[in-house]
Curated annotation (Swiss-Prot):
GO terms for cellular component: cytoplasm. The keyword S-adenosyl-L-methionine applies. This is Ribosomal RNA small subunit methyltransferase C. NCBIfam families: PRK09489.1 (NF007023).
Length: 342
């Protein structure tokens, strides 16, 4: 992260106002402004592992990655700067959590792109920190209020679930396809045959639906699941547990924390990071899969048909097959052979 996002550029227009502030940055932290902002003290909390990776290099222990913020994350902060995400339930979850810990009278700033729905912050916080719009630029809004009443926060009400083929899928705000199985994952699931064996890695596991479905008809598989999202990691753990399935689940920026090689890697890779379109994760997934597949191991991914993954697959593995498709999605399969670029 080097270039600032439009939301951060709006904040920088008011940088003089924060020189004496002790700030907690939270929400959709798409750049390293929390590490570079001139203020009395700066801390950050994020649910995104890749954001933590970047910020921790500069902020050390003053940034923390976890599902929920705790009192230690607030420390003696008197100001919250919250970057609004594109997902309103995610914002509700994060803000209620953080505001339950902030001191009464704390300055609350909410900033975000208009297209993300940042305007709804006013209604969401009306009972706790009534907001006023203090700036509008770069197609973003900046809102300010003071914390008048701390909300009560409990994680339990934010859990949700849905069923698919006899499996219970546990979800949380911010998890991909929180309200039900998405069409792409459904297509990928249709290609997974029963009695699969060996070590399987599910990258970008979301709520764990792919792994749970695979394990339900292939009990001999050994599952490893990873995601950048703390809610996804916790949801996947809960999905496996409630269905009596075993697997190793942890946070990882694609392969950053993955050790060893696998017989199959499956993924429905994201092509957005917050509001921004980004193919970085998918490109890293494909190009680096060769370092995590056994000889003869298989990479199987689903993607929107318009995305340029066939070219990357061919450049990396030498070939690819389309094993299922609809008008919108394709499932790509390739195999680790000697011609793959290691």
């Amino acid at each position: 992260m080097s270039a600032f996002t439009p939301a951060s550029e709006v904040l920088l227009r008011h940088s003089d106002d924060f020189e004496q502030s002790r700030i907690l940055f939270a929400g959709d932290l798409q750049d390293d402004l929390p590490a570079r902002f001139e203020c009395a003290a700066s801390r950050a909390h994020t649910q995104q592992f890749h954001h933590w990776q970047v910020l921790s290099r500069q902020m050390g222990d003053n940034v923390r990655f976890s599902l929920v913020a705790q009192a230690c994350d607030i420390a003696d902060c008197d100001t919250l700067i919250y970057y609004w995400p594109k997902n309103k339930p995610e914002a509700q979850f994060q803000l209620m959590n953080i505001l339950s810990l902030m001191p009464s009278g704390a300055d609350i700033f909410v900033v975000g792109e208009n297209r993300s729905g940042v305007r709804s912050a006013e209604q969401m916080l009306a009972d706790y920190a009534p907001l006023n719009k203090v700036d509008s630029a770069r197609r973003c809004g900046l809102y300010h209020g003071r914390l008048e009443k701390q909300p009560l926060f409990s994680l339990e009400p934010y859990w949700d679930e849905y069923s698919i083929d006899g499996l219970i899928i546990k979800t949380l705000p911010g998890v991909f396809s929180r309200d039900g199985l998405d069409v792409g994952s459904q297509l990928l699931l249709s290609t997974l045959t029963p009695h699969t064996k060996g070590k399987v890695l599910d990258v970008g596991c979301g709520a764990g639906v792919l792994s749970a479905a695979l394990a339900s008809h292939s009990p001999k598989v050994r599952l490893t699941l990873c995601d950048v999202s703390a809610p996804a990691v916790e949801a996947s753990r809960a999905t496996l547990a409630v269905n009596g399935l075993d697997g190793d689940v942890f946070a990882s920026n694609v392969f950053s924390e993955v050790k060893g090689r696998f017989d199959m890697i499956i993924s429905n890779p994201p092509f957005h990071d917050g509001m921004q379109t980004s193919l970085d994760a998918a490109q890293t997934l494909i190009r680096s899969a060769v370092r995590h597949l056994n000889s003869g191991g298989e990479l199987r991914i689903v993607a929107n048909a318009f995305l340029p993954y066939p070219k990357i697959l061919d450049e990396t593995f030498g070939f690819h097959d389309v094993i299922a498709q609809t008008g919108r999605f394709k499932v790509y399969r390739t195999v680790m052979t000697r011609q793959a670029k290691k």
